[in-house]
């Protein structure tokens, strides 16, 4: 599946370290800080948002009056979002991103503390790149970066 991306492989990481900008979305401050810290340890640039609506604003999708130029300035290579958030779920955020002509190619990873097969299948069928269980671990980020590298080549 991820050939050459074992736990000791630095070759997968080196070509993406400079460019991977991740938008991390979670309503829980502790979970959000944990994801941010792990991503930064993995040499990712990280922007955080406390809910789906804030994430949409950052991505330039929050206000219909905004121009698409804002999206280009704040380009992200990956969105990692919690599934269960008030106001807008991670699944709803996923759908909005995949409906956007400018963002539909951005991979979205859904995080959840609950391992519910129907939820996982629904997210994957709607375009999620991966569904991961909380808490996020450093090894998860390394696997994810290798997976993204394989998808881009």
Swiss-Prot record:
Two-component system major event consists of a His-to-Asp phosphorelay between a sensor histidine kinase (HK) and a response regulator (RR). In plants, the His-to-Asp phosphorelay involves an additional intermediate named Histidine-containing phosphotransfer protein (HPt). This multistep phosphorelay consists of a His-Asp-His-Asp sequential transfer of a phosphate group between first a His and an Asp of the HK protein, followed by the transfer to a conserved His of the HPt protein and finally the transfer to an Asp in the receiver domain of the RR protein. One of its GO terms (molecular function) is phosphorelay response regulator activity. It comes from the Eukaryota. It is found in: Nucleus. Residues 21-149 form the Response regulatory domain. CDD domains: REC_typeA_ARR. Belongs to the ARR family. Type-A subfamily. Functions as a response regulator involved in His-to-Asp phosphorelay signal transduction system. Phosphorylation of the Asp residue in the receiver domain activates the ability of the protein to promote the transcription of target genes. Type-A response regulators seem to act as negative regulators of the cytokinin signaling. This is Two-component response regulator ARR17. The gene is ARR17.
């Amino acid at each position: 599946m991820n050939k050459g991306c074992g736990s000791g492989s630095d070759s997968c990481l080196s070509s993406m370290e400079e460019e991977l900008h991740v938008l991390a979305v979670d309503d829980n401050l502790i979970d959000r800080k944990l994801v941010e810290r792990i991503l930064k340890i993995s040499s990712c640039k990280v922007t955080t948002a406390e809910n789906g609506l804030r994430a949409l604003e950052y991505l330039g999708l929050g206000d219909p009056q905004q121009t698409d130029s804002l999206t280009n300035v704040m380009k992200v290579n990956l969105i990692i979002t919690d599934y269960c958030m008030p106001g807008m779920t991670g699944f709803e955020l996923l759908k909005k991103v995949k409906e956007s002509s400018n963002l539909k190619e951005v991979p979205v990873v859904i995080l959840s503390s609950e391992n519910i097969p129907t939820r996982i299948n629904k997210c994957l069928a709607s375009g999620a790149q991966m569904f991961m269980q909380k808490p996020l671990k450093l090894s998860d980020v390394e696997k994810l970066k290798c997976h993204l590298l394989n998808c881009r080549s």
